[in-house]
C-alpha cells in the first residue's frame, strides 16, 4: 500500500476519532466551516447526482453533507478508527456513503477516472508528500471533472493565526494539531496542480472572526484558503 501518511498524524486523529461528531469538541471548527465548504463545492460543481470522492474523509462530516445534497459519495481515509465512527454515524443520519480504508494513491491505482468530483479538504497539510496526493486526485477525477482543495498558507500570519491563535490562545484546536513546516503556499499548490494536469479555476480565502466567532469566504488567502481545480477534457 502506498501510504503517504505520517504515523504520528494518524495516531493523533485516531485518538480523537470518537469525538468527530461532537460539535463542542476539537472538531467544532470543522462543523462550523462545513456549510461554507459544502455550498462552495455545490455552487461550483452541482453535487446532485454526481459521483464524488472525499479524500481524508475522517469521521464523515463533509461526506455525509454531500450525500444529503444528492451526491453518490465515496469516502477514503487511513484512520480505521475515524472510518468506524463514520460508518456508525450513518445509522444515525440515514445517509448513504461508501467508506474505504485506503490512501489516495492506492485508490487512484484502482479507480482512475471514476469520479465527477474529488474533494481533499483540510488534509494536504497533514501528509508527507502533498504533491503525490494532488496527482492522485487528478488521476481519480474523470476528464472535465472537478477537484476541490482546502489547506493552510505558509507565512508568519498563518503561523500566528493557525498555530498560536487557534491552538494556544483561542484553544479552537488541540495543541500540536498543525505543523507549520507542512503548510502549503497557494503558489506551491498551484504548481502541484499544473504538474498533475489540473487547471486552477479559483483561489478563495476563508477567515475566522474571533469577535463574532463566524467563518466567512473572501479574498484573504493569508491563512486558510480553498482551491477549485478542473481536469482538462481529453
From Swiss-Prot:
- State which Enzyme Commission number(s) the record gives: 2.1.1.222, 2.1.1.64
Which CDD domains has this protein been placed in? AdoMet_MTases
Give the top-rank taxon of the lineage listed in the UniProt record for this protein. Bacteria
BP GO terms, sorted:
methylation
Gene Ontology MF terms:
2-polyprenyl-6-hydroxyphenol methylase activity; 3-demethylubiquinol 3-O-methyltransferase activity; polyprenyldihydroxybenzoate methyltransferase activity
Is rRNA-binding found in the keyword set?
Answer: no
Q: Which UniProt keywords apply?
A: Methyltransferase, S-adenosyl-L-methionine, Transferase, Ubiquinone biosynthesis
> What is this enzyme's class at the first EC digit?
transferase
This protein's record includes keyword Cell membrane: no
Gene3D superfamilies recorded = Vaccinia Virus protein VP39
Catalytic activity reads: a 3-demethylubiquinol + S-adenosyl-L-methionine = a ubiquinol + S-adenosyl-L-homocysteine + H(+); a 3-(all-trans-polyprenyl)benzene-1,2-diol + S-adenosyl-L-methionine = a 2-methoxy-6-(all-trans-polyprenyl)phenol + S-adenosyl-L-homocysteine + H(+)
- Enumerate the residues binding S-adenosyl-L-methionine: 37, 56, 77, 121
A Pfam cross-reference name: Methyltransf_23
- Which InterPro entries does UniProt cross-reference here? SAM-dependent_MTases_sf, UbiG_MeTrfase
The pathway it acts in is: Cofactor biosynthesis; ubiquinone biosynthesis
Q: Give the family from UniProt.
A: Belongs to the methyltransferase superfamily. UbiG/COQ3 family.
Recorded hits in PANTHER family, A to Z, give:
METHYLTRANSFERASE (PTHR43464), UBIQUINONE BIOSYNTHESIS O-METHYLTRANSFERASE, MITOCHONDRIAL (PTHR43464:SF19)
Q: What does this protein do?
A: O-methyltransferase that catalyzes the 2 O-methylation steps in the ubiquinone biosynthetic pathway.
**Classification via HAMAP family:** UbiG
What protein name is recorded for this chain?
Answer: Ubiquinone biosynthesis O-methyltransferase
Q: Which organism is it from?
A: Aromatoleum aromaticum (strain DSM 19018 / LMG 30748 / EbN1) (Azoarcus sp. (strain EbN1))
